[in-house]
Amino acid sequence: MYKFSETAEVNNAPVSTGLLARMQADILMGEMRPGQKIIEQKLCERYGVSRTPLREALRQLEADGLVEYILNRGYFVIGMSDRDFEDMFELRKAYEMQAVEWAIERITEEEMESLEETFEFMEFYTMRKDTEKMLVINAGFHQIIYEASKNRMLQKLLTSFQSYLKYKNPEVVYEENYLSTLLEEHRAIFKAFTDGSPRDGVRAMEIHINRAKERRCG
């Protein structure tokens, strides 16, 4: 069973952190299969690193529950099951609903301007049918909400959820057919901010996460 940690991708990160993000992605995308034995030398060659950062990354992956160490046999891939992803979505929904409630109550004028600008970019790139840009902007929209909640631990948890969940069927979620639907879901969330209604924000976020789960998990 996947064990959640606060590890997230960081731009310009140290080698071990960047390596960890790459290995997480390879496991979650199925490049490294559940049950597969990890051969350290092969991974050192694959990622262009020495054994020290590789072992640091493996220890963190073990803490996350993505790999397991078996005495006298080495590391093996566990990965994440469909059920693990579904469970994570349930947790994410609860935390996102709390985050948006607090964010609407606590958002600053500057953060509100950033949220409005981000939503306008979502409208623009939906019109352009640019799925890659929407992937980035969607994450940014939610990140502003996390920061506006003024709860550092909640922000770290939700940022980490995003870093894992984005690997679950991203090609389905960001098909052109879904872009207008995504936009309208975020429009409802944004309207709750402009109306100053935490209740509407919680409801809009619940609908959005439920639909996101359906799109990703089926």
For each predicted feature, which ranges?
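Hydrophobic, amphipathic alpha-helical faces that serve as interaction scaffolds
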Residues: 91-106, 139-176, 216
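Hydrophobic packing residues in well-ordered alpha-helices of helical domains and bundles
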Residues: 88, 115, 134, 138, ...
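Hydrophobic face of alpha-helices
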Residues: 20, 24, 96, 138, ...
